[in-house]
Amino acid sequence: MGRFDVVVVCRSAMGVRILAALRDLDPPAGGAEMSLATLLKGVSIQGPYAEDAPEYIPLHPSEDVEREDGWSVKVFQSSDRGDVTSLTDDSELERDVCSFPVEDLWSGLAWRLRNKSSGRPNVGFQRRHLRGVNRKFSKWLEGYLESELEEAKKSGDLLLGVTQLHWSAGAARAFQKFGIPYIVFVRDELQFDHRDLYKSSLVNATAVCGAGQGLLDQIGAVFPLQRGAHVPLPVDYAERFGTVENVEGCREQGLASRTDSDVPRIAIIGVTPEKGYGFYQRLLPYVARVWPQAQFDVYGGGAYVEGLARFANTTCHGHTPVSEVFSSCDLHLLTVRSTGSWGRVINEAGLFGVPSVSVDIGAQPEAVGNGGIIVPAHADLQAWCEALKHCYTNRAELGHRAKEHAKVIDHRRSIAMFRSVIRDVLGL
């Protein structure tokens, strides 16, 4: 049986109540849920607007600045995947139970009959699942929104909805019914794959948020948006990697432990059809012929990673901590096929002084900045190989720039930008 949690993150007297309605937040199903949880927790406590925020340097404390009070945040989500985790377990919880699960027959068929070329779920079966579950979620949410509206009328509070991913169509439908302005985060190709289903949720949103102007441009080319807002992925570097000394020591030890320091080692993390599986099947043997010294280390699990193990210049390592990956590699490679959602691993590589080579699609150029090389979307294999060679030859300088650029997704900066978006859409 599916359960819906109402997670009370924080209450203040600011007169703003944020109502986040979505399928998953905690327990998180992936990075998108962790990102939104970080943003919501961030605006629930005191903090500055973007224009008042200091320049945040990863792993360093920030200077004191004027702070705004936190806002009230409620999260309406399914808990069918389990109980809350340390991500939000320090919050007060109110729990309500819903009678339907996250997955159903149609979502199961969509996955089992997924497209062999793209690796994406069967569109027809997935659409059938999404239509049904969004309809149910919307009806369930309406009961809570009605009481939230009554409470807001009595207190004079402003309401703002927030949603993302699979159940965002149902959440948006409920917000629209009660005249509640709302924000939608676009994280991946979902809305592009099901344009008719998600069009209303996006075009009627007070703002659509994405990580990177490039991604927002992709969204705006398909859906007429009222407002697009860049909110970077929030990464708490200190929580993930410790102190400056931890990161620098890890990198020094990793490089010192290498017995092949003259061999170019290129790291690839996570492989799916969207993240380059077909492309790597062409690139890896090409590089083996024209740059035989180079070696690729592929990290992650699943058939797509294993499918690259047959190339002589490639070693597959399975799931490995990011800090271990970037402790000893020379450069990092990431590509996408269609949707340019921000590659946060690019900036995590940068924190360790590792430059990246990526593709000119969506937000990838913004993620790389001047800390690596961007290859045109339709470039041939020779251009990719030359980019890898150039990045390797200039890895010291590009790595230094990548470390400087890592601050763009520091969670404190992202939270300040999200706080400013909320202020602007509500006209505070």
Predicted region positions:
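A conserved mid-protein helix/loop that constitutes part of the nucleotide-sugar donor-binding site
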Residues: 34-38, 272-286, 340
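Short acidic/histidine- and often glycine-rich active-site loop of Leloir-type glycosyltransferases
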Residues: 360-374
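Short hydrophobic beta-strand element within catalytic cores of glycosyltransferases
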Residues: 355-358
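Conserved acidic donor-binding segment of nucleotide-sugar-dependent glycosyltransferases
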Residues: 269, 319, 370-381, 389-393
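Acidic anion/phosphate-binding donor-loop and adjacent secondary structure
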Residues: 192-197, 234-263, 306-307, 412
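Conserved donor-binding/catalytic core segment of Leloir-type glycosyltransferases
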Residues: 21, 209, 256-275, 281-284
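Donor nucleotide-sugar binding/catalytic pocket of nucleotide-sugar-dependent glycosyltransferases
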Residues: 187, 191, 203-246
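A charged, aromatic-enriched C-terminal amphipathic alpha-helix characteristic of glycosyltransferases
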Residues: 245, 379, 393-426
